[in-house]
């Protein structure tokens, strides 16, 4: 029998069914994911998962389910007496939509594409440009996907690179890079978790940041995902449905080209607003982080600022600053009329409505998945007598499954890192860091593939690509790297060597690529 779990919300108290020990906990997420891929109708699929999850948690009482769902939706906007931080992401999306429309109406997108066309040699150069920008924008995955999308999209469009390929490049260089960088929103969060785990198990041979760096070198999925992106960009390694999208783009039959205006734009009108966006966002991240450190009486440090930064607020400030600069440049050029300028705001806001709707639905189902305790159920699967040699690969697969079903890598970190540390510290201390690395890799892999993940949605948004097109074209590449990564972690489990695991992953990936190319 399923027990009853009491959850105390600020605005209401209701009894929810406890699915933490039941396979039924995965039903809402699994239903939404299967329907989304099968029907290609994301909102309908997410709605089905949301409704079924609400009914299951409410013991199939329609009135209770409706009340639960309404309160959850309200909490996305307003919670604990203040506006939810999620609204900053929504506002930033709207600002980015407006900025993109302003860049288009001013002719700067067209000017930048023409400028790049004279300097970038072919489609390969356009794809490599999009991939290389991660070395500038690695501070946050949201920021990377949206900012690089705005910069690279005019260029990839001009060279007839499909939007699906651009979305793949954005997504596969976002979280994989952020998760390995200490000076990023991801790195700061993970280092904080690691510090607590090292203290819990009295491990003194590593500092938290030292352990993080060592773990990053064994995060095979993240490392080889980035390598795969550059390989795909350089050699045009197209597989599965990506082949069709690239052919359509080359024939110019994909609905992807931005509307071009008759305005003779200038390259500076794109470069300056984007530079301001990057500089203002990073500066605000440092400021909000430093302010939080000061409030807690802590000494300023770069790592500390990124650990305590407020990403949403920083993105909004950066967005406003970039729009102000873009507007000033438009005024100076005197080529855009007031009605055209106003229309650009309307067009920009409308362009983000679909992405915002998907985000709200994804956030709602993520709340339901949390109340279903899907993560707790999946984590319970690692209990029992597991051969230590297979522990890293098991944790990788389980972390991927959890992040895929819940749509959150950070939530997976919070649940699985303590479990991995407990198992490894007690049974095989030599495998502690490899096991933690495997969890990080699995979380990024699952988040990377999940159609309900924020980062997947925002990568589609940044590329202005159909969301399910992005999911289905990226999945074969992610599965290829994940397969090679699994082999690498098996080797680590038997050899206790991160270098051996790295080599095994590299060799496996090469073999898989050659096997796929021969088909």
Curated annotation (Swiss-Prot):
GO terms for cellular component: plasma membrane. Its main location: membrane. It is a multi-pass membrane protein. Keywords: Cell membrane, Membrane, Transmembrane, Transmembrane helix. The chain crosses the membrane at residues 19-39, 42-62, 87-107, 128-148, 179-199, 220-240, 270-290, 311-331, 345-365, 386-406, 413-433, 475-495, 496-516. Signal peptide: none annotated. It is found in: Cell membrane. This is Uncharacterized protein HI_1586. It comes from Haemophilus influenzae (strain ATCC 51907 / DSM 11121 / KW20 / Rd).
């Amino acid at each position: 029998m399923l027990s009853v779990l009491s959850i105390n919300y600020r605005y209401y108290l209701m009894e929810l069914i406890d699915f933490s020990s039941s396979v039924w906990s995965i039903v809402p997420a699994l239903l939404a994911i299967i329907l989304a891929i099968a029907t290609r109708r994301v909102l309908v699929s997410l709605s089905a998962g949301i409704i079924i999850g609400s009914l299951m948690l409410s013991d199939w009482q329609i009135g209770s389910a409706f009340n639960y769902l309404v309160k959850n939706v309200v909490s996305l906007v307003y919670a604990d007496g203040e506006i939810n931080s999620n609204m900053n992401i929504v506002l930033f999306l709207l600002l980015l939509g407006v900025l993109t429309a302003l860049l288009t109406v001013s002719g700067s997108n067209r000017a930048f594409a023409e400028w790049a066309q004279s300097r970038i040699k072919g489609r390969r150069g356009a794809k490599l440009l999009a991939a290389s920008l991660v070395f500038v924008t690695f501070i946050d995955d949201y920021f990377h996907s949206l900012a690089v999308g705005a910069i690279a999209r005019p260029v990839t469009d001009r060279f007839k690179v499909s939007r699906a390929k651009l979305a793949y490049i954005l997504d596969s260089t976002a979280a994989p890079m952020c998760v390995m960088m200490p000076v990023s929103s991801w790195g700061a969060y993970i280092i904080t978790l690691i510090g607590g785990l090292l203290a819990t198990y009295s491990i003194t041979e590593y500092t938290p940041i030292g352990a993080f760096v060592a773990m990053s070198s064994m995060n095979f999925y993240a490392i080889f995902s980035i390598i795969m992106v550059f390989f795909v960009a350089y050699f045009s390694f197209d597989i599965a449905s990506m082949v069709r999208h690239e052919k359509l783009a080359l024939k110019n039959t994909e609905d992807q080209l931005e509307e071009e205006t008759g305005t003779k734009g200038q390259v500076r009108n794109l470069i300056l607003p984007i530079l301001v966006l990057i500089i203002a966002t990073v500066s605000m991240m440092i400021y909000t982080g430093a302010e939080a450190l000061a409030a807690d009486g802590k000494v300023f440090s770069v790592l500390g600022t990124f650990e305590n930064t407020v990403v949403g607020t920083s993105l909004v400030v950066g967005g406003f600053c970039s729009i102000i600069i873009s507007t000033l440049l438009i005024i100076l050029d005197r080529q855009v009329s007031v009605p055209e300028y106003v229309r650009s705001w309307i067009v920009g806001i409308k362009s983000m409505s679909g992405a915002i709707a998907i985000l709200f639905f994804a956030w709602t189902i993520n709340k339901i998945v949390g109340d279903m305790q899907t993560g707790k159920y999946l984590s319970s699967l690692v209990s029992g007598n597991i051969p230590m040699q297979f522990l890293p690969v098991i944790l990788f697969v389980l972390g991927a499954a959890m992040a895929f079903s819940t749509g959150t890598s950070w939530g997976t970190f919070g649940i699985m890192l303590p479990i991995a540390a407990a198992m490894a510290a007690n049974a095989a201390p030599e495998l502690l860091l490899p096991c933690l690395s495997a969890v990080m890799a699995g979380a990024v892999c699952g988040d990377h593939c999940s159609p309900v993940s924020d980062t997947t949605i925002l990568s589609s948004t940044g590329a202005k690509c159909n969301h399910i097109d992005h999911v289905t074209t990226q999945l074969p590449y992610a599965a290829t790297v994940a397969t090679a990564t699994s082999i690498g972690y098996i080797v680590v489990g038997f050899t206790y060597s991160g270098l051996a695991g790295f080599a095994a992953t590299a060799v496996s990936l090469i073999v898989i690529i050659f096997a796929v190319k021969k088909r």
